[in-house]
Curated annotation (Swiss-Prot):
InterPro entries: CcmE (IPR004329), CcmE-like_sf (IPR036127), NA-bd_OB-fold (IPR012340). The keyword Transmembrane helix applies. It comes from the Bacteria. Its main location: membrane. Keywords: Cell inner membrane, Cell membrane, Cytochrome c-type biogenesis, Heme, Iron, Membrane, Metal-binding, Signal-anchor, Transmembrane, Transmembrane helix. GO terms for molecular function: heme binding; metal ion binding. This is Cytochrome c-type biogenesis protein CcmE. The gene is ccmE. Residues 30-164 are periplasmic. It comes from Yersinia pestis. Residues 140-164 are annotated as: Disordered. Heme binds at H130, Y134. GO terms for biological process: cytochrome complex assembly. The lineage of its organism: Bacteria, Pseudomonadati, Pseudomonadota, Gammaproteobacteria, Enterobacterales. It is a single-pass type II membrane protein.
């Protein structure tokens, strides 16, 4: 092998090793920051074809509805627990902190935290989901003041209010 080919081979090997090392380090760093999304049924019965359940200590996000009657608050601290359910089961979520204003029993919620024993998720963050038709009270009042008829009545008219 002539010296020119030899140097190109060494250069190609160094580049491949560098790319492999970089990819490995990036995947290792991301592994601790990846939060998989689970429903309560997937936590209880497994996710996917292989029915993989989350490991104890795994970071995850759980989404579902807050079970009516399951919210329990500690009167002295900000600690609370509630159950999140779907059609296939319910999982207990514990949280310490102030909940979002839209958090209610029977409402959708997404909790991000760590899976623990006893099918419990220790949440670090709780996000309340709302109906896409939700309108803040201020906007609703403004719409009532500015629009005396429903939006459907405005279809088929031009900007002057005359029928098209």
């Amino acid at each position: 092998m002539n010296p020119r080919r030899k140097s190109r081979l060494y250069l190609a090997m160094v580049v491949l090793i560098g790319i492999s090392l970089t990819t490995t380090l990036v995947l290792y760093a991301l592994r601790s920051n990846i939060d998989l999304f689970y429903t309560p049924g997937e936590i209880l019965q497994g996710k996917g074809e292989r029915h993989e359940k989350p490991a104890i200590g795994q970071r995850l996000r759980i989404g579902g509805m807050v079970m009516p009657g399951s919210v329990q608050r500690d009167a002295k601290t900000l600690e609370m627990s509630f159950q999140v359910y779907d059609a296939r089961g319910a999982v207990t979520v514990t949280y310490t902190g102030i909940l979002p204003d839209l958090f209610r029993e029977g409402q959708g919620v997404v909790a991000q935290g760590v899976f623990a024993e006893g099918n419990t998720v220790h949440a670090k963050e709780v996000l309340a989901k709302h109906d896409e038709k939700y309108t803040p009270p201020e906007v609703e009042e403004a719409m009532k003041e500015n629009h005396s008829r429903p939006a459907a009545a405005y279809r088929g008219t031009n900007t002057t209010g005359n029928a098209l």
